[in-house]
Regions:
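Short hydrophobic/aromatic patches on beta-strands that form ligand-binding or substrate-lining surfaces
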Residues: 21-29, 86-88, 137, 150-154, ...
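Beta-strand-rich, repetitive solenoid scaffolds
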Residues: 7-9, 38-40, 48-52, 58-62, ...
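Short surface loop/edge beta-strand patches of beta-sandwich-type extracellular domains
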Residues: 1-18, 68-78, 140-142, 178-186
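Acidic glycine-/aspartate-rich tracts in secreted/extracellular proteins
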Residues: 26-32, 42-43, 63-65, 91-95, ...
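Extracellular glycan-recognition modules
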Residues: 3-60, 94-97, 161-164
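Short tryptophan-centered beta-strand motifs in secreted/extracellular beta-sheet-rich domains
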Residues: 23, 81-92, 103
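Extracellular glycan-interaction patches encoded by glycine-rich segments
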Residues: 125-150
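Extended recognition patches within non-cytosolic domains
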Residues: 1-4, 95-97, 111-118, 149-214
Length: 214
């Protein structure tokens, strides 16, 4: 997807406190800053997930040019031959700060962070809002493009889901494998979507018709 980005402008506003993002990716290049996705109003108001130049990842939210959420992993992600399933499950209404954002890599929750700034309770993140906000998949709004492949990119817009909604452990090999049928605990939500189900289709498979464009 180098130098390619997918775009969607939400037409509805759903919960900005509860949502889940899941995607499968294979890195085509390491040791470079690459944004996997961002939701962006402007440079000072956005939410994004990216790989850093040292191959850690960062999930962050900027509000009014200030960091409202920053989680940067200690773990390094340098495997360019295998697939990673990343699940980011958010519920800022939780009383315990570490329960407000949970990040899973291949079904295992990441708990070791070099930087860990959790959102304040009940914070509304910069996501899931109609108007001028835009989803970008594969870039940070026309910069820091992701180099690699993606598949089964899903957004559940109103609930914090478990990673088992999107994948399962193979009973023989112990490997985390994709679930080709995704059923959220409640529903995808009005702004929810599932694209790249076949690795290339931008047509939403969730029945919401939230189709992306190049």
């Amino acid at each position: 997807m180098a130098n390619t980005q997918l775009q969607l402008s939400p037409t509805n506003t759903n919960s900005r406190q509860k949502f889940t993002v899941s995607f499968w990716l294979k890195r085509g290049k390491i040791n470079s800053e690459q944004c996997v996705w961002t939701t962006r109003l402007d440079s000072g108001n956005n939410t994004l997930f990216k790989f850093n130049a040292n191959d850690t990842f960062t999930f962050k939210c900027n509000k009014s040019n200030a960091d409202a959420l920053v989680l940067t992993s200690n773990a390094l992600f340098r495997d360019a031959s295998g697939w990673y399933n990343v699940v980011i499950a958010v519920d800022t209404t939780q009383s315990t700060d570490t329960n407000r954002v949970k990040i899973y890599i291949n079904g295992v929750q990441e708990t070791s962070f070099g930087t860990a700034t959790y959102p304040s309770q009940n914070l509304s993140l910069e996501i899931n809002e109609s108007g001028n906000q835009v989803w970008y998949i594969g870039s940070e709004s026309s910069q820091n493009y992701f180099d690699g492949s993606m598949s089964y990119f899903a957004f559940v817009s109103e609930t914090q889901e478990a990673p088992t909604v999107f994948g399962s452990t193979d009973s023989t090999t112990g490997e985390w494998q994709i679930k080709t049928s995704i059923t959220p605990s409640v529903a995808f939500g009005t702004n929810g979507f599932l694209i790249l189900k076949d690795g290339s289709s931008l047509t939403d498979q969730s029945s919401n018709s939230n189709n992306f464009s190049l």
